[in-house]
Amino acid sequence: MTLVDLSITPIQLVQAYGLVNVAYLPQGATADFDARSANLLSSVGLPHSEVFTSREDVEDPYPADLDPTTLGSRFDHYGMPCPAESRSWRMLGYLFTSLVAVDPASGRVYAFPEGSAGYIALHRDVESLVYALVEFRKLEVDHDNDVDPEELSRRFKQVVGAFDPVPFAHEDSQWNLSLEELEHGMW
């Protein structure tokens, strides 16, 4: 599979997170995904960090007959209600405390905030999610180098918002909440 017209490359992701912090999905695991998402997940991958956790906890094994990446079976396993339209969506990981899932048919990415029974649109597609995570990693590095938090927040919103306005459309988006914490010195 070739990387056709993707705005993020495997090299950019590895440079931002390091090779050991990139998780790739096997092509077979993405067979029911839209072609663009399947290509990105198997060729570019997802980062794994404190901000975005893309790997399962090996200390929390699941029964052999459970698919923990499909939201319906995952939510059922934990005794949580799962909105009917999202039962076939696939879990990608956690962004801070929000479970992040993709609708494999459309490629749209949604967040299930902790303590909420519903979900909100997070990104127009998986490419936008990975793009935002790479930009957020740059923000983290600059924050560690004492760049002004308000400048970092403004720049992140400008760069990511120009690529995809969805991450900032909902006031309770995990991106908006984390940038608010950054601006208020809670990091």
Which sequence ranges carry the predicted segments?
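A surface-exposed partner-binding patch
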Residues: M1-A101, A162-W187
